[in-house]
Amino acid sequence: MNVHRMKKRILLLLLVVPALLKAQDVMTGTRQELTSPDGAYRFTFYQRAVGEDNAQMYYTLTYKNRPVIEESKLGVLIENQLFESALGVPNDTCHFWCENLKLTGTERRKADETWKPVYGERAEIRDCYNEMTLKFKKGEGDGAQDGGYDKRKNYFMNIIVRAYNEGVAFRYHFPETTNGLFLHIIGEQTSFTMPQGTMAYYERWAQGPYALRPLEGWGKEESERPLTLKLPDGLSVALLEAEMVDYVRGKFRLSADKPSTLETSLYSSVDIISPYSTPWRVIMVGERPVDLINNNDIVLNLNPACKLADTSWIKPGKVFRSGDLKQERVKAAIDFAAERGIQYVHMDAGWYGPEMKMSSDATTVSPDKDLDIPALCQYAESKGIGLMVYVNQRALVQQLDTLLPLYKKWGLKGIKFGFVQIGNQRWSTWLHDAVRKCGEYGLMVDIHDEYRPTGFSRTYPNLMTQEGIGGNEEMPDALHNTILPYTRFLAGAADYTLCYFNGRVKNTKAHQLAMAAVYYSPLQFMFWYDRPEFYKGEEELEFWKAIPSVWDDSRALDGEIGEYIVQARRSGNDWFVGAMTNTEARTVTLTTDFLEPGKKYLLHLYEDDDKLNTRTKVRSTHKKIKAGDKLVLKLKASGGAALHFTPLK
């Protein structure tokens, strides 16, 4: 045998033997698989032996036979000795709570239905998935029972896995038990081992900047969710969270022990009573980055259906902020809103006094403010406008139950929650309960600062939007703005607070115009930091006047993360398209095959043009086109284009 052939055999053995050993380590009867309805996703679960009696749970995920998640741990970390002692249950002595769980059964089911949201990015949403429930038991003996109270050292846990064509999600579920099981969750073992060479769009906090970083060298830093990743084979992956209502916020940290591995990092511990389900951990994969955007309904599908009996009062729309807290100035804002096709006026912080003082009373107007809110509500209603107010969480925590009936009596339509604390179990539960209560009084909600959505607006659609984004309050550049559609907006609506005339904006006016089509927010704040008198009849602002804030259909047509985005949205028969580029100029060819075949349209096109002798330098073009025509958009650096297609009769 020659040396070359011998080297090849040795190399083959080095590759095969570890694989065989791994296969032998998998415990008999624990391997379970689940595929998506179209067969693209394959989720594989199994347990490996740890010592003589224990086991560790693992999973892998492939997409079209390409590795997405390599062998990764599953599990929940529970420290239950105090509860067990109080209940007279023998203490659990396992190093990791999940290590002696035994798989006792598996249930499978399928679902395929279509539902209509109260509002959204699409008029109908298909909810189609395959589901697998893995059932586990911890403990053996029947133990002692006292007066009907079960003192057996038995615990039960399920892992529920759903495979959609849009992605895969799993969660931990603790069934109800006769011993009224208390659980003190101190962490999760949930991890995501990515292919070597994966890059992450790292974001340290919800309103922070993004950085494309390898899965190494993060130290103790954590990244926000959603976390979008670029795999070395070109796939785009997003890790998200769904139905986080009374749990704690999860972020992502790097494993100290295993390369290219992300771990779920919980904000703090959680105390629960069974039955209880943890939030869904969601994995989406796209061959193109825009596939992630087009599949974002998965987050809503993982949440319960609407629980409000009457939703007729919930009216999405555009919002103008009034920072001038004087009666006549708010009236001027209402007049401007009525003129410019805006549905709401928002009275910002300070109307009831210094917002950061616990003594400020949000049931009354500050003595130094010339404001009569009930009279303003009546004036706004006469103009077809709704009035909303800002209230800091400091006042909400103390006065919420008093404020809600009062604000309804005044005629207010909504509240913006300000400087909301979010992360631990207490504040997560409080916040979602506050949204529920607002729904009982017919008040819409916009949550500001660090809160990020996980689909609660399906269940309580009076939660219209939320910040949790580096928007125009931070004045980000075009690079940041072209990352957002592929990251933050995957989780749901975001209140970016669109600016237009403000001189601190770093991007072109056409870039800002396009945001109204690219960025989804059922309450879309426009002209942030502007005043009514700033408007001088600019023709391009007819785009903002015409555009709605919710849609019958939405399609991300083209783009690359941090480079550019082309987003099309339909309301009725009209289509609106926004194109945005990063800090580099580029030419984008737009094929209008999203339009109805055989129909002709009038196109209103708004583009940057530095040659114009106007202050906004936006060129307006109006021309007839037919479905399928190609349009060449020359986007200026940090620029964009806004397009409105209206069918011709």
For the regions a language model picked out, list residue spans one by one.
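Bacterial Sec-dependent N-terminal signal peptides
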Residues: 1-29
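Solvent-exposed beta-strand/loop surfaces of large extracellular or lumenal domains
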Residues: 123, 144-146, 202-210, 605-628
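Glycan-recognition and catalytic regions of carbohydrate-active enzymes
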Residues: 134, 531-576, 611-616
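Carbohydrate-binding surface patches
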Residues: 561-597, 641-642
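C-terminal beta-strand-rich structural cap/linker in extracellular carbohydrate-active enzymes
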Residues: 623-649
